[in-house]
Amino acid sequence: VPVRFLSDVQRNALAGWPEEVNAEALERFFTLGVADLAEVRRRHGDANRVGWALQLCALRVLGFLPDDVRSAPSDAVRSVAHQLDIDPTALGAYGQRAQTRQDHAGQVRDYLGFRLARPEDLDGVRAWLTDQALVSDRPAALFRLACAQMYELRLVRPGVTAVEQQLVGVAREAARREVYRRLQPLLTAERLVVLDGLLVLDPDLGMTPARWLARRPVAASPKAMLGEVDKLVFLRDLGVEGWDVSVLPAKRATSL
């Protein structure tokens, strides 16, 4: 099972509306154009019109539709309602029938040219994301890339957990296996002995060489600099600089 990397706070934030919207974002993402206004006015009733318009704005800016349209930031609600010449409180009566919300969601998707992702769509995004993970497998960055790619493809973003585990988690694991596959020819019997030795406790260091190499200096001092030089000398003595890792993207090779 792919590892979860998002905290509950992050997951909740990514699943819904932002808590607030600044003036620049209001103008950029919550301004309805002439065609938008004409489409909104095809709906009957103030509640349906303001609710539909907010779903339109949500998909346009977020790439998905929050479960509760009525939880939109108050500034956004007021701005959209003002453009429609509707009392903002009308939103409170929106979507009392689940079918209405679902119908409107489909209409908004069609209007903006979005569609729900099919399994084959997600397979394509996952393959693309695996290529990105070969360069850098930072999960938060991959999450953003996955969302941006789906937006570019006009695919409605699935739920946060689906993106986190089924896309990012699986892509990271696939990239990790691909890194190992590409590096396999480097792992000669002699080098395996060297690598295994890094996991053996060194009495002089008081820890394993692997842990010593991974430790970062806590301060910029002459002693710390000498310690880093000692690590470089240690690795040079092992012949690491002669290991050809050009089969990996430069950024990924640097991070090893």
Question: Model-predicted segments: where are they?
Answer:
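Long amphipathic alpha-helical coiled-coil/heptad-repeat bundle
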Residues: 2-256
